[in-house]
UniProtKB/Swiss-Prot annotation:
E.C. no: 4.4.1.13
Protein's job: Catalyzes the cleavage of the cysteine-S bond in various cysteine-S-conjugates. Cleaves L-cystathionine, as well as S-substituted cysteine conjugates S-benzyl-L-cysteine and S-ethyl-L-cysteine. Releases four human body odoriferous sulfanylalkanols: 3-methyl-3-sulfanylhexan-1-ol (3M3SH), 3-sulfanylhexan-1-ol, 2-methyl-3-sulfanylbutan-1-ol and 3-sulfanylpentan-1-ol; the release is obtained after the sequential hydrolysis of the Cys-Gly bond of the odorless Cys-Gly-S-conjugate precursors by the dipeptidase TpdA, then the cleavage of the resulting Cys-S-conjugates by MetC.
Reaction(s) the record says it catalyses: an S-substituted L-cysteine + H2O = a thiol + pyruvate + NH4(+); S-(1-hydroxy-3-methylhexan-3-yl)-L-cysteine + H2O = 3-methyl-3-sulfanylhexan-1-ol + pyruvate + NH4(+); S-3-(hexan-1-ol)-L-cysteine + H2O = 3-sulfanyl-1-hexanol + pyruvate + NH4(+); S-(4-hydroxy-3-methylbutan-2-yl)-L-cysteine + H2O = 2-methyl-3-sulfanylbutan-1-ol + pyruvate + NH4(+)
PANTHER family with a match to the protein in the record: CYSTATHIONINE BETA-LYASE-RELATED, PROTEIN MALY
Superkingdom per UniProt: Bacteria
Keyword Lyase applies: yes
Name of the protein this chain belongs to: Cysteine-S-conjugate beta-lyase
Gene Ontology BP annotations: biosynthetic process
Length: 377
């Protein structure tokens, strides 16, 4: 697979490549630098040639639900009911709708968290209850803390699996525990599985497989196939009452899905599997390179080795840098853009998130820039 160089990547013109000056290597927002899967490009080109630029096809005229169900069966060993899968603009919108229409009470958010989930409770007119996502060296939740939050009035918990920014994965036992707690307090478990296709060795576990009554799952092809701008995530419901609730929601609230997004998602799930496997292989190589080289390049650096995602949460507290906002320093002095740890909420101090979904050459250059900038502190 051929990688694009920085000059070519900048011509993409997306947020990643327009946020900063051209001398900055962007490794912040979760966009991949990998080439688009041929099956997706072919499907989009075909749709463009047919001038498929109008409103989304009628539900009976596309097969997105079947494509998602087949992919889940192949990748995770669990097949959801295709008739209970519905498109939604993006994962954040899906989680917001789940809070607004399917839950009561406060929202539990494990922090540090994917930063759009920090204000989502307020957007839904609810309060946020923070719990730590840093239990143990490899991340995880303290179930006593989860239960206490539900006991204190929470009606739902957002479970990002695989976790962003840490890159760790929930076990089947942990998911069942969370769901059992939610069930006891008549709460809901809102599961974000957007990074689930990108795992290294371990198989992703779907919380809803064992807990269809309390889970609402939201996923998308946005991260694994880099098509976030096409706007098509998927709500996966696993009980009939939730489907009835979804169908009763005002269509204005559910609007925003892109026609080309449906086309791209179907192509990704059905014909993008080989490309996905190649990406995972390359991402694992990038991750392993970082694990091997970061400690010598940046003495004192600490990090969780991600089991999934293309994101690594770096802790600079014991390096020569040792500031609360390392990304700001590195943007100025290394000309590398990372995501600031404090933007992920409490527990993000001294940390920064690195997106390593790029070529080995760009990854090496960016890491060496960071090392040089810290060395002269």
């Amino acid at each position: 697979m051929q990688f694009s160089n920085l000059d070519t990547l900048r011509t993409r013109g997306t947020r990643k490549w327009t946020q900063f000056d051209d001398d900055v290597i962007p490794m912040f927002v979760a966009e991949s630098d990998f080439p688009t899967a041929p099956a997706i490009k072919e499907a989009i080109i075909d749709a463009c040639e047919r001038e498929m630029f109008g409103y989304t096809p009628a539900p009976h005229a596309h097969h997105l639900g079947e494509a998602v169900a087949d992919f889940y069966d192949w990748r995770y060993g669990w097949r959801p009911d295709a008739a209970k899968i519905f498109p939604v603009a993006d994962v954040v919108r899906g989680v917001l709708l789940a809070i607004q229409y399917f839950t009561d009470g406060d929202v539990i958010v494990p922090v540090p968290a994917y930063f759009p989930f920090l204000p989502i409770a307020e957007a839904a007119g609810r309060n946020r209850i923070d719990i730590s996502s840093d239990k143990g060296l490899e991340g995880g939740l303290d179930m006593a803390e989860v239960e206490e939050a539900f006991k204190n009035g929470a009606g739902s918990i957002i479970v990002t699996n695989p976790f962003n920014p840490g890159g760790w994965m929930f076990t089947s036992e942990e998911l069942d525990q969370i769901c059992d707690i939610a069930r006891r307090y008549k709460g809901r478990v809102l599961v974000d599985e957007i990074h689930a296709p990108l795992t290294y060795g371990k198989r992703h576990v779907c919380a809803a497989a064992n807990n269809p009554d309390v889970c609402i799952t939201v996923t998308a092809t946005s991260k694994a196939w880099n098509v976030a701008g096409l706007k098509c995530a998927q709500m996966i419901f696993t009980n009939d009452e939730d489907v009835k609730t979804w169908n009763a929601i005002n269509p204005v609230a559910k609007d925003g899905v892109g026609t080309l997004g449906i086309i791209a998602a179907e192509a990704a799930y059905e014909s993008g599997r080989e490309h996905l496997d190649w990406q995972v292989e390359q991402l694992k190589a990038n991750r392993d390179w970082l694990v091997e080289n970061l400690p010598s390049l940046i003495p004192g650096i600490r990090f969780e080795i991600p089991d999934a995602t293309y994101l690594m949460f770096l802790d600079f507290k014991d390096t020569k840098l040792g500031v609360d906002k390392p990304a700001a320093y590195l943007l100025k002095h290394a000309r590398v853009a990372l995501s600031e740890g404090v933007d992920f909420g409490p527990g993000g101090e001294h940390r920064a998130r690195m997106n390593f979904a790029t070529s080995p050459e760009i990854l090496k250059e960016a890491t060496e820039r960071i090392a040089r900038a810290i060395e002269v502190v």
